[in-house]
Amino acid sequence: MITKQQVLEFLKNYDLDNITIATVCSHSSLQIFDGARKEGFRTMGICVGKPPKFYEAFPRAKPDEYLIVESYEDIMNKVEELRKKNVIIIPHGSFVAYLGTENFAEMAVPTFGNRAVLEWESDRSKEREWLLGAGIHMPGKIDDPRDINGPVMVKYDGAKGGKGFFVAKTYEEFDELVDRTQKYTIQEFITGTRYYLHYFYSPIRNEGYTLSEGSLELLSMDRRVESNADEIFRLGSPRELIEAGIRPTYVVTGNVPLVARESLLPLIFSLGERVVEESLGLFGGMIGAFCLETVFTDELEIKVFEISARIVAGTNLYISGSPYADLIQEDLSTGRRIAQEIKEAVRKNQLDKIIS
């Protein structure tokens, strides 16, 4: 992984009055570009081939310029060009997936957030160690598939967007569906309501909901719409579907907004706080936007089954603010909050605390 010192050397040659915010044209890029423009930054969209035409339909979120690459791996050959334009990269889930975690870790361009989180986020066993170390309640983990005696969720390492997930109730079902060439995790299937909680951790603000270092914000929350799981049971009972050879899949196709009972907010903040505090000790902190992927049970317990350590697509619901973000600042999206953090870090001469 590129070192923090190397990144700081690059920043010495930056014109900090003319920073360009850049990301790959996908995932949450519209929101990122819109938020950056609202905070006075130039924007750059990175794309393979011709720029997507749909950006013409959204002029407020259309990037000021494009970097055209032959492939996503080709971004690694454009790092000098990016640095000459004072670029700070905003990583989102698709950016990391398309470029590859190894390339992303080595990319010689200043990047918002702490790249050290990749090691802990992409390995499900390390992710579990992190969350359990923070005192987070997680679904039970089953090490031997022969011990399956009820519904379980099976996830392959690195699976995102719902791909690579399946549910099994017996070892026989597991054995029929599993791809043993991939590394997988078996988790207890928790019944309840799924909530995806969108937080923002700032190491440079010391107001509001403060932690041992910096402060924590809750910006929004959502639930994912999944195909075909959300509609499949209109066709019959689970048993009838299985007999017909139809099994649910969990590919994310969109998102719907949610708010939580106000009485749950103390627990929601506590979860975010514990995860951040644990990250500070493990790898120097998870900076900026992150999401805890949870299930709220009928006993009002919150179980966390995964973490995403950067902006998630569910925040796209709230480009003009959310019921929570509106209580911090009007018209505050996660994309705009990222731009504010960079702007504030430049003003305070603390960019070293938020980039890697």
From Swiss-Prot:
Residues holding Mg(2+): 293, 306
Obligatory cofactor(s): Mg(2+); Mn(2+)
One GO MF term attached to the UniProt entry: ligase activity, forming carbon-nitrogen bonds
Record: residues binding ATP: 145-196, 226
Record: residues binding 5-amino-1-(5-phospho-beta-D-ribosyl)imidazole-4-carboxamide: 27, 94, 255
PROSITE patterns associated with the record: ATP_GRASP
UniProt-listed SUPFAM superfamilies: Glutathione synthetase ATP-binding domain-like (SSF56059), PreATP-grasp domain (SSF52440)
Keyword list, A-Z: ATP-binding, Ligase, Magnesium, Manganese, Metal-binding, Nucleotide-binding, Purine biosynthesis
Reactions listed under catalytic activity: 5-amino-1-(5-phospho-beta-D-ribosyl)imidazole-4-carboxamide + formate + ATP = 5-formamido-1-(5-phospho-D-ribosyl)imidazole-4-carboxamide + ADP + phosphate
A Pfam cross-reference name: DUF1246
Gene3D superfamilies: 3.40.50.20, ATP-grasp fold, A domain, ATP-grasp fold, B domain
GO biological process, one term: 'de novo' IMP biosynthetic process
Protein's pathway: Purine metabolism; IMP biosynthesis via de novo pathway; 5-formamido-1-(5-phospho-D-ribosyl)imidazole-4-carboxamide from 5-amino-1-(5-phospho-D-ribosyl)imidazole-4-carboxamide (formate route): step 1/1
Role description: Catalyzes the ATP- and formate-dependent formylation of 5-aminoimidazole-4-carboxamide-1-beta-d-ribofuranosyl 5'-monophosphate (AICAR) to 5-formaminoimidazole-4-carboxamide-1-beta-d-ribofuranosyl 5'-monophosphate (FAICAR) in the absence of folates.
Similarity comment: family membership: Belongs to the phosphohexose mutase family.
Name this protein carries in UniProt: 5-formaminoimidazole-4-carboxamide-1-(beta)-D-ribofuranosyl 5'-monophosphate synthetase 1
Organism: Methanosarcina mazei (strain ATCC BAA-159 / DSM 3647 / Goe1 / Go1 / JCM 11833 / OCM 88) (Methanosarcina frisia)
